[in-house]
Amino acid sequence: MIANIISQAEAALFSEGGFYNSYSKFGAHLSKDLKNEGVYFTVWAPNAVAVSVEGDFNDWDGTADYMEMLDGGIWTIFIPKAKKGDAYKYLIKTKKGDFLHKGDPFAFFSEVRPKTASIVFDLDQYEWKDKNYQKHPDRKNHLKRPMNIYEVNLTSWKKNLDGSCYTYSQLKKELIPYVLEMGYTHIEVMPLTEHPFDGSWGYQATGYYSATSRFGNPDELRDFIDACHDVEIGVIMDWVPGHFCMDAHGLGEFDGTPIYEA
């Protein structure tokens, strides 16, 4: 039997509001044990009657993989056949008898809109290349240095001829040189959290751990940040947790009750 990814102590900390690294256990995490390959799924839905995982690995059969409920309303399961790149959602049965198809609040990656599923992603493969930037003495004296911030919405800054957004690779080639030429020291990126509606500028999120897939995957985002740091451009992310969208797959009424609105 595969042990749960989250311990009783961590579950207790989460219930008390003190598990500050909850993202390391909640959501979808690939097993590090080569003898037991698969994915751990963990979600908080304290008022749900039942929760299962539906996705590419079970042909979206919501009856195939029911989760176990732990203390504090935490649901978890290990699915051996799940792998990196698989799309998935949680199927939540509420006390009213409704069935909700929800994205993962702790997902690291999601489908490109208008699709709404979460995607299993491994964040541990990328190696940061900005050690020199992080160790630079000026990093400790930023309050005493001139600062000129370029705020940008990556969705609307430039588009391809077909109307699609620029990728991180394209932004590396065009946005970074522009910022340097104009004398900016930092790029402030308007919210990168996943969101369904371009017009919200990213302020109506569906989750706070999933960087939007509009421009590429999380590793491509980190490569973009590395490229900024390589030329001494700092990166600031606009992050607003005060509100989120109420789309059916999002955080609103997540388990049939307002657990994220409260």
Language model regions located:
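The feature marks proteins involved in alpha-glucan
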Residues: M1-N36, Y40, M69-E151, S156-G163, ...
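Short beta-strand elements bearing conserved aromatic residues within extracellular beta-rich modules
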Residues: V51-V53, Y88
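Solvent-exposed serine/threonine-rich low-complexity stretches and specific carbohydrate-binding patches
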Residues: G62-L70
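Substrate-binding/active-site clefts of carbohydrate-active enzymes
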Residues: K131-P146, N153-A262
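Short proline/glycine-enriched turn/loop motifs at strand-loop junctions of beta-rich domains
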Residues: W44-V51
